[in-house]
Amino acid sequence: DSTSRWAEALREMSGRLEEMPGEEGYPAYLGSRLAQFYERAGRVISLGSEGREGQLSAIGAVSPPGGDISEPVSQATLRIVKVFWGLDANLAYQRHFPAINWLNSYSNYLDDMEPWFNENVKSDWMQVRQNLMSLLTEEASLNEIVKMVGMDALSPQDRLKMEAARSIREDFLHQNSFDEIDTYTSLPKQYDMMKLVYAFYEEGSKALKDGANIEDIVSMQVRERIGRFKYTKESDIAEEYSSVQEALATEIATLTQDKED
């Protein structure tokens, strides 16, 4: 549903009725009308036969002019909803789909969902997710430095963070909707994908402390296998996951051994 077009129609009707306009010509009751729409969503006990429960999700598309979310419709919507997916034109230009900005988007249901993920997927799901989000946040800060002085000015540890964040973006967040396997990914597979990407960062950090060269770490052959893990069939996930983990450990051990020699 296009919330923006609905709000524009509401503004037009309000003007025709000569009602007192609010910010940017929208009626003063814009927020309450939006709340009535979104509050229809939720979990309900249906009428009729006993014991029937149902759920209704409402997803509204807000299209602010020029992408400026400070305008009234966006602000009124954000005050009501608890989940926000911010589409980013720059990601779309880079052919990164889904073009959802991971820094601007959020969900206020994370704390409520944590017990479910712990019970039905893995007990450390939220911790792994937080680790990846921390790397993406640090990448955004480091990008400002890279724009001014270049990648070569970064320390080896910061370069590793940049490479790990790139792996998160390209190997986990990026999705090919035209690929039969990558179109849908189960939660257990998503967990394994996150673990592999973060394992590269963890093992790489240990290798740096042991004296390994950052160029050797970022050019490891196992990174290609990590990137292609998302195209693994569900039936082959466990075997491929173990194989990639072993390959990563072997290459890291080789790098540190060569340094000692």
Q: Where in the sequence are the language-model features?
A:
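C-terminal amphipathic alpha-helical interaction region
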Residues: 211-261
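P-loop NTPase catalytic core
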Residues: 2-225
